[in-house]
Curated annotation (Swiss-Prot):
Compartments (UniProt record): Cytoplasm
Presence of keyword Signal: no
Name this polypeptide is given: Dephospho-CoA kinase
Cysteine-cysteine disulfides: none
UniProt keywords, alphabetically: ATP-binding, Coenzyme A biosynthesis, Cytoplasm, Kinase, Nucleotide-binding, Transferase
Enzyme class at the top of the EC tree: transferase
SUPFAM superfamilies xref list: P-loop containing nucleoside triphosphate hydrolases (SSF52540)
Any one cellular-component term (Gene Ontology): cytoplasm
Residues in DPCK domain copies: 3-191
Gene assigned in the entry: coaE
Binding locations of ATP: 11-16
Length: 191
């Protein structure tokens, strides 16, 4: 089994491509969804409130605002949540060893040094204009958080340079499908 990490800048199309791969029958893991599931655990919520006493009650939007405005709080939360995320990722890989490929979307893959858990990395990219257009359509969009995420993340060009493969999501669906088909063919040569 090959483990493929998918990364990219905010609103670059990572989740769209992960969902496309899932619809095609590939096993997929989404770090953001995993963290949302972890956050539902009352014990974990209590631990986070102790870790971040600035929060009066557990609220994901308040956590986002805090961690994108306070580097120390962000680091504390990452140091707490990343080991749990790694455990879930390792379990996902163990449960799917009978598949040729598994795909995992990890937005901060390089920044959090998650690349060590993957055989190959694919960076999804598109223009800044397209990313902004996509971002503003999200219910949770906040321009300040968007800019802070851009500041925290490696540049799109750096992610492309580090990756084994890159997919331009700023194209029509037919072209995108061609790129994904080419990726799968390239990966099949590696099995």
């Amino acid at each position: 089994m090959l483990a493929i990490g998918i990364t990219g800048s905010y609103a670059s199309g990572k989740t769209f491509i992960l969902n496309y791969l899932s619809e095609k029958g590939y096993k997929t893991f989404c770090a953001d969804n995993c963290i949302k599931e972890l956050y539902k655990d009352i014990v974990l919520q209590t631990q986070i409130l102790k870790l971040l006493p600035e929060l009066k009650y557990f609220n994901i939007r308040k956590i986002s605002n805090l961690i994108y405005n306070d580097d120390i709080a962000r680091e504390k939360l990452q140091n707490f949540i990343y080991p749990l995320l790694i455990d879930k990722l390792i379990l996902f890989k163990k449960e799917n060893t009978n598949y040729k490929f598994v795909f995992s979307e990890i937005p901060l893959l390089y920044e959090a040094k998650f690349d060590q858990y993957f055989d190959f990395v694919v960076t999804i990219y598109c223009s800044e204009e397209i990313r902004m257009q996509r971002a503003i359509t999200r219910a949770s969009f906040d321009i300040n958080i968007y800019n802070k995420i851009k500041e925290i993340q490696l540049s799109q060009d750096s992610k492309i340079a580090k990756a084994d493969f890159a997919i331009n999501s700023g194209v029509d669906m037919l072209d995108l499908e061609k790129q994904i088909t080419k990726l799968i063919k390239n990966l099949e040569c590696q099995v």
